[in-house]
C-alpha cells in the first residue's frame, strides 16, 4: 500500500525497503526476501559503485552483520507494531491512526539508517575516482529512467501507473479487488495528484548532498576514532534528512491509505488480518533464528 518517496536517496532507500515491507507494504516471500537482503544489497550497490575485489569481502560481511543485528534487535519491535495494526484491520481506520503507526515506525527506520552508516562510511570513504565516475554515470542513467517514467508521461498515463501500483499492493494484502473498487481507488488517486516535479527536485537535491559527502571524504584514512565517528555522524545526518517525511505529504498519504481501507469488504479485511498474521509469524521465526 505504501511506496517509498520517489525522491528518496540512493542507499537510504535500500536500507529501509525491508522495514516498509514489514509494516504496511505487502512483500511476497517475506522470509526469503529478508534473508537474501545482504546478497541483493551487494549487487544493487555494485551497480552504482562497481565494487572492487578488494572491497567486496568487507562490504558483504558488513551487510551480513547489519542483517544479523536487525534480526536480533529490531524485529521484536516491528512484530509488536504489526500486531497492533492487525488488531484494527477488521474495522474502519482513520488517517490519524495510520499516521500514528508511521510515527511509531520512524525510530525503526532511523535505527537501520544509523547502523548501516556505521558499516558504510569507512567503505565509502575509500572509493576511487574511477568509482565516483561510475557512480555519476549510474545516477545519470537512473535519473533518465525516472524522468521517462514519472515526468515525461501525460497526466492520464501517470494516473494509470499509480493505479496499477496501488491495486497490486492492495491485492497482496486484501486479496482480489473488484472493478468497482478499482474505479473508486482511481477516483481517490485523481483527487490527490502526486507532485512529481517536487519529488524530482528532492531527488536531485539528495543525490547532490550524498555525492558531496562522497567527495568530501574521498581518500580520508579515518585513522582515528574521532575521524571515523565524524564521518559516520555526517552520513547518518544526511540519510536521516533524506528520509524525513514532510508533514503535509504524511497526512495526505495516511488519509489516502485509510480511505483505501474503507473501500474494502469485511471478507477482504479478514484477508488482511490473515496476511498480517503471516508476516508476524515469519518475522518472529526470523528473530528466533538469530
Task: Name each region found by the language model.
Residues 73-111:
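Mid-chain, structured segments of secreted extracytoplasmic proteins
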Residues 121-240:
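Extended amphipathic alpha-helical interaction segments
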Residues 1-11:
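N-terminal secretory signal peptides that target proteins for export/translocation
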Residues 42-43, 200, 207-290:
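A cross-kingdom marker for long, charged
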Residues 35-70:
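Start-of-domain marker
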Residues 28-31:
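Bacterial signal peptide processing site
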Amino acid at each position: 500500500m505504501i511506496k517509498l518517496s520517489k525522491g528518496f536517496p540512493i542507499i537510504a532507500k535500500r536500507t529501509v525497503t525491508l522495514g516498509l515491507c514489514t509494516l504496511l507494504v505487502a512483500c511476497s516471500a517475506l522470509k526469503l526476501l529478508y534473508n537474501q537482503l545482504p546478497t541483493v544489497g551487494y549487487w544493487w550497490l555494485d551497480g552504482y559503485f562497481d565494487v572492487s575485489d578488494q572491497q567486496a569481502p568487507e562490504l558483504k560481511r558488513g551487510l551480513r552483520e547489519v542483517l544479523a543485528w536487525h534480526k536480533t534487535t529490531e524485529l521484536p519491535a516491528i512484530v509488536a507494531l504489526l500486531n497492533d495494526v492487525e488488531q484494527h484491520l477488521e474495522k474502519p481506520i482513520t488517517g490519524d491512526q495510520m499516521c500514528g503507526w508511521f510515527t511509531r515506525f520512524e525510530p525503526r527506520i532511523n535505527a537501520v539508517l544509523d547502523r548501516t552508516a556505521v558499516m558504510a562510511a569507512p567503505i565509502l570513504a575509500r572509493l576511487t575516482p574511477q568509482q565516483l565516475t561510475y557512480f555519476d554515470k549510474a545516477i545519470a542513467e537512473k535519473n533518465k529512467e525516472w524522468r521517462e517514467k514519472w515526468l515525461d508521461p501525460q497526466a492520464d498515463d501517470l494516473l494509470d501507473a499509480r493505479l496499477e501500483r496501488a491495486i497490486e499492493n492492495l491485492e497482496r494484502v486484501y486479496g482480489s479487488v473488484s472493478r468497482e473498487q478499482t474505479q473508486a481507488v482511481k477516483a481517490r488517486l485523481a483527487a490527490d495528484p502526486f507532485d512529481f516535479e517536487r519529488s524530482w527536485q528532492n531527488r536531485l537535491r539528495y543525490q547532490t548532498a550524498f555525492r558531496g559527502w562522497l567527495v568530501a571524504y574521498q581518500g580520508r584514512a579515518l585513522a582515528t576514532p574521532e575521524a571515523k565517528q565524524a564521518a559516520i555522524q555526517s552520513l547518518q545526518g544526511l540519510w536521516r534528512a533524506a528520509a524525513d517525511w514532510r508533514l503535509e505529504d504524511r497526512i495526505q498519504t495516511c488519509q489516502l491509505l485509510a480511505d483505501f481501507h474503507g473501500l474494502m469488504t469485511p471478507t477482504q479485511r479478514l484477508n488482511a488480518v490473515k496476511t498480517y498474521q503471516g508476516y508476524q509469524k515469519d518475522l518472529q521465526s526470523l528473530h528466533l533464528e538469530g
